[in-house]
From Swiss-Prot:
Belongs to the universal ribosomal protein uS14 family. This is Small ribosomal subunit protein uS14. It holds the Pfam family Ribosomal_S14. The gene is rpsN. Part of the 30S ribosomal subunit. Contacts proteins S3 and S10. PANTHER family: 30S RIBOSOMAL PROTEIN S14, SMALL RIBOSOMAL SUBUNIT PROTEIN US14M. Keywords: Ribonucleoprotein, Ribosomal protein, RNA-binding, rRNA-binding.
């Protein structure tokens, strides 16, 4: 199990990035638009840099929903490889069987 503080910190980052996503996207669009004057683009860049660091989407870690493990997480299932194996061995995932050859 991961530390509760690490999981809570990640959840806080997720909420913050979701809340400021549209604002961040709008500012990025202004910064990347070559038709807008250099002065306005610079102001938008400063506003973008004044946003909280944790509001960036790449600061969010994909964590296992069961254990909180940060590595080896299947994106589609949001479960780590270890938790997936345990659930599969206990027969809790339909269609998943232990392989034998």
């Amino acid at each position: 199990m991961a530390k509760v503080s690490a999981v809570n910190k990640n959840n806080k980052r997720i909420k913050l990035s979701d809340r400021l996503f549209k604002k961040r996207q709008a500012l990025k669009k202004i910064v990347m638009d070559k038709k807008i004057s250099l002065e306005e683009r610079f102001k938008a860049q400063q506003k973008l840099s004044n946003l909280p660091r944790n509001s960036a989407k790449n600061r969010v870690m994909n964590r296992c929903q069961i254990t909180g493990r940060p590595h080896g997480v299947y994106r589609k299932l949001k479960i780590s490889r270890i938790a997936l194996r345990d659930l599969g061995l206990h027969g809790l995932i339909p269609g998943m069987t232990k392989s034998s050859w």
